Design a protein with these regions (language model features):
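A structural alpha-helix within SAM-dependent methyltransferase catalytic domains
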Residues: 50-53, 119-123
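Active-site micro-motifs of SAM-dependent methyltransferase domains
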Residues: 92, 110, 141
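A structural helix-start
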Residues: 66, 112-113
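S-adenosyl-L-methionine-dependent methyltransferase catalytic module, highlighting the catalytic core
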Residues: 113-121, 131-163
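A short beta-strand submotif of the Rossmann-like class I SAM-dependent methyltransferase core
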Residues: 102-108
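Conserved N-terminal segment of class I S-adenosyl-L-methionine
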Residues: 1-98, 102
Length: 163
């Protein structure tokens, strides 16, 4: 596993910068503004959500990994930011999160087995005029198989291994 994947606070910062420098400007261009509420599915430590919170958005992150959710709460508290983070399977979220004008899926969709059920289920969390932002690694890219998070030092630095 590469260092950037074991140092979760650094990874949080990396995600935050990517979101601030690329996602928010792109979303502003496409939607015309920054939505007031944002839901991220598969949020991990919440790094993608931090710039939205700093911009005054109400943010909610959902992740199946309870450890990541605790880290998100800690990282947000350290930065004096508000965010709601829930450790649950997205299929179990039910009506806890509704009416979001923006749902983020960053490097998540490739991990969902039942994509049709997943995507159709997101509608109940989306506002009538809402948008879903989907980012994913291209399979044909050097690290499209996520081998960079492998525990083997050799495998984690070996591009195209998944092909």
């Amino acid at each position: 596993m590469q260092k950037r994947h074991t140092d979760r606070e650094s990874y949080f910062g990396e995600q935050s910068q990517t979101s601030k420098n690329y996602y928010i400007p792109y979303i502003k261009e496409v939607i015309g503004h920054i939505p007031d509420k944002v839901l991220e599915v598969g949020c991990g430590e919440g790094g993608n959500l931090l710039p939205f919170a700093e911009a005054g958005c109400r943010v909610m992150g959902v992740d199946i990994d309870a450890t990541r959710i605790e880290q998100a709460r800690t990282f947000f508290a350290q930065r004096h930011q508000q965010g709601q983070f829930i450790a649950t399977d997205i299929f179990q979220l039910k009506d806890k999160a509704t009416n979001f004008p923006l749902i983020l899926l960053h490097d998540v969709i490739e991990h969902i087995r039942d994509k049709e059920r997943f995507l159709s289920g997101l509608q109940k969390h989306l506002s009538a005029d809402g948008a879903i932002f989907v980012g994913f690694p291209a399979w044909q890219m050097p690290f499209g198989g996520h081998q960079q998070i492998a525990h083997s030092r050799i495998v984690s630095h070996f591009p195209f291994l998944h092909l």
